[in-house]
Amino acid sequence: MHLAYPAVLSALLFCTGLYGVLARRNAILVLMSVELMLNAVNLNLVAFDVWLSRAAEETLHSGQALTLFTIAIAAAEIGIGLAIVLAVHRNRGTSDIDKLRDTAEGHEPDGPDTDTPATGTAAEKAEATA
């Protein structure tokens, strides 16, 4: 098998994952897209390991060992990421990245703040309540 086939498939998977990271607003879908990108890198590592071992006539399998390490790191990353998304969803009620960014910056997406009146100073407010 030629090196071009897994390399093209890896590039397509990586581009699909990159599109998902840039276009999706749901945090879980973004995590899934990151995992797709990591799997594309893993495919590329194994393909180049097989190609280089045939060219050098050695069997070091360093690409496969690195792929196993990457899979272990990706499993830990997805576990921690899903735990964070679940905690944020319980606290904020949404997993939409734009809405989370707006609430973190203190912006009210519903409209103007109703706690402060539009006119009047502190002295006028004190006289009005007395």
UniProtKB/Swiss-Prot annotation:
Keywords: Cell membrane, Membrane, NAD, Quinone, Translocase, Transmembrane, Transmembrane helix, Transport
Composition bias, Basic and acidic residues: 97-110
The keyword Translocase is annotated on this UniProt entry: yes
InterPro entries in the record: NADH_UbQ_OxRdtase_chain4L/K, NUOK/Mnh_C1-like
Catalyzed reactions: a quinone + NADH + 5 H(+)(in) = a quinol + NAD(+) + 4 H(+)(out)
Pfam families in alphabetical order: Oxidored_q2
Example GO biological process: ATP synthesis coupled electron transport
Any one GO cellular component localisation term in the record: NADH dehydrogenase complex
Mode of membrane association: Multi-pass membrane protein
Region (Disordered) residue spans: 97-130
Example GO molecular function: NADH:ubiquinone reductase (non-electrogenic) activity
UniProt-annotated location(s): Cell membrane
Its EC number(s): 7.1.1.-
Biased composition regions of type Low complexity, renumbered to the chain: 114-123
Major localization class: membrane
Transmembrane annotation, as ranges: 3-23, 28-48, 68-88
Family stated for the protein in its record: Belongs to the complex I subunit 4L family.
Function of the molecule: NDH-1 shuttles electrons from NADH, via FMN and iron-sulfur (Fe-S) centers, to quinones in the respiratory chain. The immediate electron acceptor for the enzyme in this species is believed to be a menaquinone. Couples the redox reaction to proton translocation (for every two electrons transferred, four hydrogen ions are translocated across the cytoplasmic membrane), and thus conserves the redox energy in a proton gradient.
Subunit details: NDH-1 is composed of 14 different subunits. Subunits NuoA, H, J, K, L, M, N constitute the membrane sector of the complex.
Designated name of the protein: NADH-quinone oxidoreductase subunit K 1
Source taxonomy: Bacteria, Bacillati, Actinomycetota, Actinomycetes, Kitasatosporales
Gene from which this protein is expressed: nuoK1
